[in-house]
Design a protein with these regions (language model features):
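Activation segment signature within eukaryotic-like protein kinase domains
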Residues: 176-177
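Conserved short submotifs of the Hanks-type protein kinase catalytic core
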Residues: 140-154
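Juxta-kinase regulatory segment immediately upstream of eukaryotic protein kinase catalytic domains
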Residues: 1-23
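A short, aromatic-enriched beta-strand patch in the conserved N-lobe beta-sheet
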Residues: 133-134
């Protein structure tokens, strides 16, 4: 859709309204259906009234962002898994680390969405959901992101460690894994670490194309390095090095581990690491014991064990995964070359990009408010002039402020 134009449009005065037939409008988009609920709002299917194209619109309720920031959670443990009482744990340590670093996330409730926008607006890949437009509804305190429609939803419903899902077919497992692999290779080639690879963030289009989404946890080190600080992501998909107290790790191997956990889920319909709390899951990951239920597939299990290798320094790389016999189907399947897959180069995303990504919206809000006040003043002046004119026409007296006095009704 619109491949010739890669720019992101900003609509600063979009509002939610009702259409003539009683439907819901968001700016120039007609809401067709509700696709699901995210951490910060609802995801809709919507149709452009200008082009007729159908998109997904991702809602960000600013109040929810502020509440999450005030609670100090900022995308910590997900899936409703309770923390053990009396332990600060991994995510408390993360918050302490972020505060020590003076991280923007601690003082700016829009930090997460600004990071996602700054990265998303520069990406162009067939297996990454593209951002087209940002809509700002100041009346309802909501931001909307217009993105590629992936109306078939997540590739697999495995949002919690005790969840069971239908295993994917061998054909779909291979297809969707290679789609995700190409997306991850593209990101890593641009120096972007996703940090939240999981089935929930792998969505399917109507044509069964997998698109990677959700860059709220992603980073792109300005110095071109590969080191990341602090734990991030969803516990069941975290690499073991993230479950330790290390303040700095290499980002790419952690993403590969997470993709390996996803592949395990595709094949077996469950996750390899389980627990009723975040800490139980971390203990399971740290123990490093992986069982392989179902029929034995030597090539597949070799790939899984190498992707979920505990040592990040010896974990399999993306280039090695490309040549793995399970991926190549023993030489009968060929991926697009790395040069073709990564041909759209991304400019380095700086802190300035993150800070200024919403500036087109924020800059114009004072101007909008000023125009609103000007309209009120003009209306008052117009009303006064009209009152003066009516007084002249009817020869009616005026009060001290120039308003027409009402004559007393004659007594009966």
């Amino acid at each position: 859709m619109h491949e010739e134009d890669t720019s992101v449009k900003y609509s600063v005065t979009a509002e939610v309204s009702e259409s003539n037939d009683g439907g819901m409008l968001v700016g120039d988009y007609t809401i067709l259906d509700e696709l699901g609920h995210g951490s910060f709002g609802v995801v809709y299917m919507a149709k452009s009234r200008k082009t007729g194209e159908v998109y997904a619109i991702k809602e960000y309720n600013k109040a929810n962002l502020r509440k999450r920031q005030q609670m100090g959670m900022m995308r910590g443990a997900r899936g409703g898994m309770p923390m053990r009482p009396g332990r600060g744990g991994l995510f408390a340590a993360r918050q302490m680390l972020l505060k020590q670093q003076g991280n923007e996330e601690d003082s700016d409730p829009f930090y997460l969405i600004k990071t996602e926008l700054a990265i998303s607006k520069k990406l162009k890949h067939p297996h990454i959901a593209r951002l087209y437009e940002v809509l700002n509804d100041t009346k309802h305190d909501v931001l909307y992101l217009v993105i590629d429609l992936c109306n078939k939803g997540p590739v697999q419903e495995l949002s919690s460690t005790d969840a069971k899902a239908s295993p994917l077919s061998a054909e779909d497992t291979h297809k969707y894994f290679t789609h995700a692999l190409l997306a991850l290779e593209y990101l890593h080639e641009q120096g972007i670490i996703h940090r939240d690879i999981k089935p929930d963030n792998m969505l399917l289009t109507e044509d069964n194309v997998l698109k990677l989404t959700d860059f709220g946890e992603s980073i792109m080190p300005e110095d071109g390095g590969h080191k990341v600080k602090g734990a991030s992501g969803t516990p069941a998909f975290m690499a073991p090095e993230l479950c330790q107290d290390a303040s700095e790790i290499t980002g790419e191997p952690a993403d590969i581990w997470s993709l390996g956990v996803c592949l395990y889920g595709f094949v077996y319909g469950e996750l390899p690491f389980k627990g009723s709390t975040v800490f139980d899951i971390i203990d399971s990951i740290s123990a490093g014991e992986i069982s392989y239920p179902g029929p034995y597939d030597e090539q597949l299990q070799n790939l899984l064990s190498r992707m979920m290798e505990r040592n990040p320094d010896t974990r399999i790389t993306i280039s090695e995964i490309r040549g793995h016999p399970w991926v190549t189907q023993n030489g009968t399947f060929e991926l697009p070359s790395k040069e073709i897959n990564c041909q759209h180069i991304v400019d380095t995303i700086t802190k300035e990009d993150v800070d200024n990504v919403l500036q087109p919206i924020f800059d114009i809000i004072p101007l909008i408010n000023a125009f609103a006040k000007l309209r009120i003043i003009r209306r008052r002046i117009r009303d006064k002039h009209e009152a003066e004119q009516r007084a002249k026409d009817h020869d009616l007296p005026e009060d001290s402020e120039g308003n027409t006095k009402k004559q007393k009704e004659p007594e009966e």
